[in-house]
């Protein structure tokens, strides 16, 4: 039985650097979903400013990990018309290809809303779509454009969820853990994350990037 474990972190803030260091320590690859049009955007979380990074300066930082699109400006996709939706993701992918020298990119949905219209428009532009929808079971999605989330790193029951995953009897089981690196800083979760990654590693799951998973289980047509 194979158990595939993916880590998917959104927004591309300066705190990704610390998360990459933790992932490297535990030899776990991650997928980092970036917005190339928001480098100067600052917002507050828990009363502190969250700082984004200059993406063009992060090529070495993310080496050994995957970068994916999170749209250009992190808009709610269901509020965009068809052409704007294509541009938001297509332009972001073009920027990331130029900066990182990659050919294929996946996409992680900003916020939570992404319906059939959005999937049908975006599927020709990207290799896969990671949704923001939660799924209880660990079965593989029917296609690479409906990849769910199985837990956030700071969910109260995340340890139990991971343990349940380790006991799955499916021939191939999938667990996608998501989050934001700025939460590690603002909530002082660095030590917590270090221990959680060690717990994940103790099960000897097949930890891989989202693109590695998609290419391995969903051949191109």
Question: What is each model feature region?
Answer:
Residues 1-15:
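Boundary/entry segment of secreted carbohydrate-active catalytic domains
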Residues 26-117, 124, 135, 140-146, ...:
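Metal-dependent polysaccharide deacetylase catalytic core of the NodB/CE4 family, i.e.
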Residues 18-22, 117-121, 161, 192-196:
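A short acidic, amphipathic alpha-helical/loop segment
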Residues 2, 25-27, 31, 97-98, ...:
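C-terminal domain-boundary segment and adjacent tail
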Residues 11-14, 110-114, 153-154:
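Short beta->alpha connector loops
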Residues 82-87, 156, 187-190, 194:
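Non-membrane alpha-helical structural segments and their capping/turn regions in soluble enzymes
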Residues 8, 69, 130, 134, ...:
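Glycan-processing catalytic domains of CAZymes
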């Amino acid at each position: 039985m194979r158990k595939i474990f993916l880590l998917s972190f959104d927004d591309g803030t300066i705190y990704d650097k610390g998360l990459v260091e933790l992932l490297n320590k535990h030899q776990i690859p991650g997928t980092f979903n970036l917005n190339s049009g928001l480098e100067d955007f600052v917002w507050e979380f828990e009363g502190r400013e969250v700082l984004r990074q200059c993406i063009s300066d992060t090529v070495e930082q993310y080496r050994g990990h995957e970068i994916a699109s999170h749209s250009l400006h992190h808009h709610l996709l269901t509020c965009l018309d068809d052409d704007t939706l294509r541009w938001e993701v297509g332009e972001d992918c073009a920027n990331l290809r130029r900066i990182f020298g990659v050919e294929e990119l996946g996409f992680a949905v900003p916020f939570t809303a992404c319906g059939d219209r959005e999937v049908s428009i975006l599927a020709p532009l990207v290799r896969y779509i990671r949704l923001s929808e939660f799924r209880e079971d660990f079965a593989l999605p029917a296609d690479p454009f409906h990849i769910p989330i199985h837990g956030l790193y700071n969910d109260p029951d995340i340890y139990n969820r991971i343990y349940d995953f380790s006991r799955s009897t499916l021939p191939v089981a999938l667990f996608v853990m998501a989050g934001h690196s700025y939460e590690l800083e603002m909530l002082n979760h660095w030590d917590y994350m270090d221990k959680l990654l060690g717990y994940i590693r103790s099960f000897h799951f097949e930890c891989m990037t989202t693109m590695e998973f998609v290419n391995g289980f969903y051949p191109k047509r």
